[in-house]
Each structure stands twice: as structure tokens, then as C-alpha cells.
Amino acid sequence: MRLNPDCIRDILLYVEENTGYMSYIPVPRNVHNFDIVLQNNYEPDEILYHIDLCEEYGYIHTDSGTIANFYIKRLSVLGHEFLENIRQENN
């Protein structure tokens, strides 16, 4: 699968908007039941692949959760810096 920088950006923006202290995003391991807003723009497999890359890059913190789900806990400092750099480039 190819790297899609737009997908990474959209995931990070979604995480920033939808997480908080003790407020996680459940992500089902069964991609066919994936109802995240991003699914309107990306295929479920592409979203999960890029969530994995976001974790690998150190942009997000996740928790393994259960057999059915894992959880996106929050953005990391690097994730916040990445979004801030994008916002500065767009101004």
C-alpha cells in the first residue's frame, strides 16, 4: 500500500478533535465495521494502515484493548507538532 500523507493528516486531525483526557477512540479490528468519519474519504484498510504508521512514527498513543478493538488514546507531542507545522504552512 502506498503512503498517503492526506490520510495521515486527516487521521491526526480526527484524533485531535475526538480524544481528550481519558476519552479514547475505539478502533475495531474488523475493518468492515469501521464507522470512523474518515471512511467517507478512505477505504477501511487504508485507514488502519495509516493509523499503524501514525503509531510507528510516534504521532499517536494507542492501547491494545481487546480482541475486537484497539484504542487511540491521544496525539503525542510529535503529533501535535506535526499538525502545528501543517497549520503554519497553510497560513
Language-model-detected regions and their locations in the chain:
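A short, conserved structural fragment
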Residues: 55-65
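Alpha-helix boundary/capping detector
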Residues: 37-41, 80-81
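Generic structural signal for hydrophobic core residues of well-folded globular domains
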Residues: 15-18, 54, 83-86
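Short amphipathic alpha-helical interface segments
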Residues: 2-37
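Short, amphipathic alpha-helical interaction segments positioned at domain boundaries
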Residues: 70-91
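Peripheral peptide segments
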Residues: 2, 21, 39-42, 64-69, ...
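Short amphipathic alpha-helical interaction segments
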Residues: 39-57
